[in-house]
């Protein structure tokens, strides 16, 4: 069964950089990097691995960087 997950991204600026992701299914996820570009580059593999650990297979992932939103379809 296919279902969609919407994740809001909040960028927190600091020495290490930080992305905080929130959704109904995923209370929070924090990804640290040296720059905002690095954080966004790492977003796809980190989310795929996390969802795989949870037992969901990612079918599509759309990362809307300007809108600070990630949409994931899983089965």
Predicted regions and their residues:
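A short, exposed loop/beta-hairpin motif centered on an aromatic-Gly-Thr core
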Residues: 27-37
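Short, charged, surface-exposed hinge/linker loops at domain edges
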Residues: 1-7, 12, 37-75
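Short aromatic-glycine-(Arg/Gly/Cys) micro-motifs in beta-strand/loop hairpins
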Residues: 12-26
């Amino acid at each position: 069964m296919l279902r969609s997950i919407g994740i809001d991204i909040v960028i927190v600026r600091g020495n290490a950089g930080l992305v905080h992701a929130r959704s109904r299914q995923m209370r929070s996820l924090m990804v640290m990097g040296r720059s905002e570009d690095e954080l966004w580059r790492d977003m796809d593999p980190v989310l795929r691995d996390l969802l795989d650990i949870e037992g969901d297979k990612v079918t599509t992932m759309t990362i809307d960087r300007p809108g600070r939103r990630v949409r994931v379809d899983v089965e």
